[in-house]
C-alpha cells in the first residue's frame, strides 16, 4: 500500500522567509542604484546584465491569484502560466516585477510573444 503524505516537512517553513529575504535584498539593491533585470527564461546569458552592473532576478508565477486581473486584458483560453505572469506584472503583486528596470522574456510560445 502506498503511504500518502499529508504534512509538509519542517524545512518548507523556511521558504516563506527566504522569499521575503530575497525581496528585501532586491529592494536594497534598488536603493543602492543597481539596475534590476527580470528574466522569464534560462536563455538569457546572465553575464550580459551582470557586465552592465545589473542584478538578475528570475520571474516566475507562483500562484493563480492574479489570473482574474490578467483576464481583463487577455483571452480566457490563454495558458494559465502566461495569465498569471502577466497578472503579477500588471498588479505589482510581485516585488521582482515591481523592481525590474527591464524584463527579458523568450518567444517560446504565442502567449509569451503577445505578453
Predicted regions and their residues:
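An N-terminal assembly and electron-transfer interface module characteristic of large anaerobic redox
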Residues: 1-115
Amino acid at each position: 500500500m502506498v503511504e500518502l503524505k499529508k504534512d509538509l516537512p519542517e524545512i518548507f517553513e523556511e521558504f516563506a522567509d527566504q522569499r521575503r529575504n530575497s525581496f528585501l535584498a532586491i529592494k536594497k539593491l534598488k536603493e543602492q542604484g543597481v539596475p534590476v533585470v527580470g528574466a522569464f527564461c534560462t536563455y538569457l546569458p546572465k553575464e550580459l546584465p551582470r557586465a552592465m552592473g545589473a542584478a538578475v532576478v528570475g520571474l516566475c508565477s507562483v500562484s493563480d491569484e492574479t489570473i482574474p486581473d490578467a483576464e481583463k486584458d487577455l483571452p480566457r483560453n490563454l495558458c494559465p502560466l502566461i495569465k498569471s505572469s502577466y497578472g503579477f506584472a500588471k498588479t505589482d503583486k510581485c516585488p521582482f516585477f515591481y523592481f525590474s528596470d527591464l524584463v527579458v522574456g523568450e518567444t517560446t510560445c504565442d502567449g509569451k510573444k503577445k505578453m
